[in-house]
Structure formats: structure tokens, C-alpha cells
């Protein structure tokens, strides 16, 4: 069995650093790099791309709403499809340019924060994100939350997709993530998370907060790099998967 581990990196800004990117880079097989709207800047983007190239890690754009103060986790009421297409295309293009400068190549796109959360449940937003990706480069892989509106949008646009589950997030009965505003939305116990990921990958399913089993395709597992103990959690997940015979490899190289 083959599985990818992805992580959101490059989410600092200026002198401020978020998480231990260097350590996470040695564990993840694909990384999603902030493109300046919710976090990141040209220097951090270049540094992150360069590290990824050195580790043989695939890179993707991680576009979000323009919201540095809110880290891209706040919705933007009234935003239009055209505005979403523009901001997504802008951020993909920014990372492509920085990647070219560093001698690496962007392979995928994964929406960040509120943009992703809204797109998972709203057809217009999901289709706008997919349309922007297709317009910039139809060969880019669209990372989608399994069983969400993003899957429908990716299929309609004819994009290759990597279906994602989250190692440290809990799920509602409809397959969407429990809101971070609710208690228990984010898990922190490294051993529990590792065991949970192994079950998800082996069974092709997640278990919701009420115990409902939700079958889904799983190509990649997201491990957040900005939570307490992130490096230990990521290392534990990878070790647990490999001990059970999984090959951890970038989805872009399968």
C-alpha cells in the first residue's frame, strides 16, 4: 500500500516563524507552501522550496483568503467566483515563479483554511478554485478533502486529484471536518493519532465523532506542522505506517 504524507509549511512571515519546517520536511513527502495571502513572503517561499528540493519533497501551492491577521481562517462574506479565481491563480503563479527561481516544480494545489472549508460545502467556491487551477496549469493535481464538494468540482474540471484525510482532525457525520471552534476538533495525542491514521489508510474510511464509518478514497494524509508536538506526531505517523508495510511516497510520483 502506498500513501503520501502532506504538511502545510512556509507559514511564517518576515521575522516570525510558524512551526519547525526543517524537521517536518524530513518526514513529509509533499508540502503545501503558503503564497503570501494568509502567510508566507517571497523569502520564506524561496527558502521552503529550496529545502523541499534538497529533501526530494513535492511542492504545492497553498492559496488562502487575503487575511494575514486571521491566518486565512476567516470566511470572506460576499466574495464572488471571479474574485476567488483571481486570488487562487495569483497565488499559484507566485509559487511557480519562486519555484522556477529555485529550480523546483509545483506539482499540486491545496486550498487553505477558510477557503478550503467553504469550498468543501459550497459548489460555487469549489468550482472557482478548480477553474483557477485548470486555467493556470491543467496538469496540476488538486488536493481535495475526500467526499467533499471539492471532489465534484475537480471531476467537473477534469483535474487529477489526490483525496485527503487529516491525521489530527475529527470528522462530522457528513464527512466534513469538525470546526476548530468546537471542542475536540483537533487531536493532540501522538500515539492515538498514529493508530488512527493506520486504521484510516488500511480501511479506506474515517470514523466520525458519533462513531459513523465513512468510506472514502485516501491518497494523502495531512499532518499539521503548527500544532503542539507536531514533529513527534508526524514522525510517529510515518513510523506506524511503515511498520505496517506502507510505502510513503509523494502522490505526484505514483
From Swiss-Prot:
InterPro entries: Glyco_hydro/deAcase_b/a-brl (IPR011330), LamB/YcsF/PxpA-like (IPR005501). The keyword ATP-binding applies. One of its GO terms (biological process) is carbohydrate metabolic process. Keywords: ATP-binding, Hydrolase, Nucleotide-binding. GO terms for molecular function: 5-oxoprolinase (ATP-hydrolyzing) activity; ATP binding. Its EC number is 3.5.2.9. Transmembrane segments: none annotated. It holds the Pfam family LamB_YcsF. Forms a complex composed of PxpA, PxpB and PxpC. Belongs to the LamB/PxpA family. This is 5-oxoprolinase subunit A. The lineage of its organism: Bacteria, Pseudomonadati, Pseudomonadota, Alphaproteobacteria, Hyphomicrobiales.
